[in-house]
Amino acid sequence: MRIKSILLSLSAVVALSAGVANAATNLVTNGNFSDTSQGGNKQLAYTTNNIEANRTTLDGWTSSNRNDRYNFVLDTAIANTDKSVKWMKTSIAGGLGQGNVFASDSQYLPGTLSQNITGLTAGGLYTLTFDFALAQQVGFNGVNNDNFWQVGFGDVNPTQNSALLSIANGGFSGWKTATMTFAATSTSQVLSFLAQGTGPGAPPFLLLDNVSLISAVPEPSTWGMMLGGLGLVGFLARRRRAAKLA
């Protein structure tokens, strides 16, 4: 009976720790690109002022490049149809990529997508995760090799690259998940994504979704809850031992 009680208590601690971990605050605003100024399925504007009807912006994000040309918000539900602002040859919907996704052509005036992240602790480590994929536009042919997202976080940290994605003519890479760790050097830093590729290919569109940045080290409150749970297990064990000796 004593062992069963301790095991139940341990299970409670594990569940508590997992719940706290899952509740870690995502410091990225609009990481799934669902919030836009003028709807999805449009080309991104480089400014929030006087936006044309066929342009949109992503809440929390800035799209920067010459004449705001080849950065887009695509709707995965229609991306492989002629209703899409950029018609992909295959479906890009999947378990990871759903709804709005950010799309950029690495070979034709790609623009940096960036967001200023606040609430950081200088010297703290942060884990960045995001989902990404590679697809090809209708009307073009050719192999697309070695495309990747170049990720920056502040002016001091070196950039990091996602895994290379390559597809055959008309192919789709499927959705992948990238995980990176960065150190904060100040209380606010700019997180940025830039589509890159080593070969011209034929309109390779890199896709991005579900961007998340969380502290890599549990906050003091998290440690307190975990230690409190472990203390409870110890207390129950001592109480049962004392009851048995009495």
Task: Walk through the language-model features, giving the residues of each.
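Bacterial Sec-dependent N-terminal signal peptides
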Residues: M1-S9, A242-K244
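Aromatic (Trp/Tyr/Phe) and Gly/Pro-enriched flexible surface segments
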Residues: A24-T121, D131, A135, N141-W149, ...
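Conserved aromatic beta-strand anchor motif in extracellular beta-sandwich/beta-rich domains
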Residues: V151-D155
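C-terminal membrane-anchoring or membrane-association module
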Residues: F235-A246
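Short, threonine-centered small-residue motifs that mark membrane-proximal processing/anchoring sites
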Residues: L7, A12-T25, P204-F235
